[in-house]
């Protein structure tokens, strides 16, 4: 999936990107770009989501990694963007709490779930929680609220403590996704990342879940194809 989450770099026409077979596009507003979002971009985003080449709305969400000062504008922008949600099109969420605090992470997931339920009451909405690092209670909360919630895992699993490991183990096998998040994250071996390195993510996930990497890889691919209706 090719993700365009900076309004300034959205493609003019996603259908003319000439992507390789099997690739598709997501468009959204990363929370760090929330300040740039306005009426002009809202209208553009609405039109882009009508393109048959666009398969998802995202990334959208809340990112407190640079402090809480921008939380208000990020929250307002998220509420606004969620007005464009469509049940047949997955929402890709990006959540990051301030600091390395597992309790703050789980609290952020709970807070945004409440906001999402208010703006997107259709519980048939498909959801992809990108780079998920919540606990098992968070998995249950989102799954109960939106049964179509999928949980994505990247090379970040190599640094998981007990709490997010419990969350990873609690994810149903048919709701687990694998992510490279390239080029932003290094892969689990510390190399420059690429979607072709996804097997290394599968190995990291498999170690936590006590499964074979090949089974994890097969499940992740099948789940991604089903979620994005690309099979």
Task: List PLM regions with ranges.
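Mid-domain alpha/beta scaffold segments of enzyme catalytic cores
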Residues: 1-231
